[in-house]
Regions:
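Ligand-binding face of N-terminal immunoglobulin V-set domains in extracellular IgSF glycoproteins
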Residues: 102
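N-terminal accessory/capping or targeting/presequence segment of soluble
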Residues: 1-95, 109, 113-116, 120-236
Length: 236
């Protein structure tokens, strides 16, 4: 049984009629680790941006004009190429002229992206926390516990405590109770850390949540939080 048919079997179990697969992972960075390149796994396409829409009887790959020729050479025969903006996902969904349930991994999409995809269609969206591509991808390589390091002051120029203090003042000024930061480049800058999660950029993946007093109440950097950084943050 090929990958698409396996995915459709999982869709049936979830009572879904379709499924979305983006290029990005949950950190929305420019570079996607090989073991999170779900679009390549399901379609064969290796370009830097794209979106797959899997229906019960058809499969679509949406790419912009830069990638149409590349996609023709790479994609599996199950897929039809749709060049954006000539054909957008909501065109396909709208022209189905029927109600369908569209499954997606909520970690991989913003609300605005979803609104654009389902606009003017009869689509009901259904978040599925366990990614269905991962369920099909049995031989996926394990996520590496990539190391990261703290920059010396001569390189970053400003202590992370000073930066957090500025955030604290801003939150109080605007009467904001919490600030969630998920952009990996912002976190790397804020905490003066660098890493190797991206193949072509010294970034470390993570998410950070501040309260209105500027205190870090949640820090997620995979499972890599080493003792030195942990001690520094706990002093705050």
């Amino acid at each position: 049984m090929n990958k698409i048919n396996q995915l459709r079997n999982f869709l049936n179990k979830q009572n879904c009629d379709a499924y979305l697969i983006p290029k990005n992972d949950e950190y929305f960075g420019e570079y996607v680790p090989k073991n999170k390149d779900r679009l390549k796994f399901i379609s064969g396409f290796t370009g830097s941006t794209g979106l797959a829409l899997i229906l019960k009887n058809k499969s679509y790959l949406f790419v912009d004009g830069r990638y149409t020729l590349q996609a023709k050479k790479e994609i599996y025969k199950d897929f039809k190429i749709c060049e954006i903006p000539k054909i957008k996902p909501h065109y396909i969904l709208k022209n189905l002229n029927k109600e369908i349930t569209l499954g997606f991994d909520p970690k991989l999409f913003t609300s605005n992206t979803l609104k654009n995809i389902i606009s003017n269609s009869l689509v009901k969206i259904k978040p599925i926390n366990n990614n269905l591509i991962d369920a099909v991808w049995k031989n996926k390589t394990k996520i590496n516990n990539n190391k990261f390091y703290i920059l010396e002051e001569k390189y970053h120029g400003e202590n992370y405590l000073n930066k957090i203090s500025k955030i604290n003042k801003f939150l109080k000024l605007k009467d904001i109770h919490y600030l969630l930061t998920t952009a990996v480049e912002n976190i790397s800058w804020l905490l003066n850390i660098r890493g190797s999660d991206a193949s072509s950029s010294p970034l470390t993946n993570g998410k950070i949540l501040f309260n209105k007093n500027g205190k870090i109440i949640y820090l997620q950097i995979l499972i890599k939080l080493h003792l030195k950084l942990k001690n520094l943050l706990e002093r705050k």
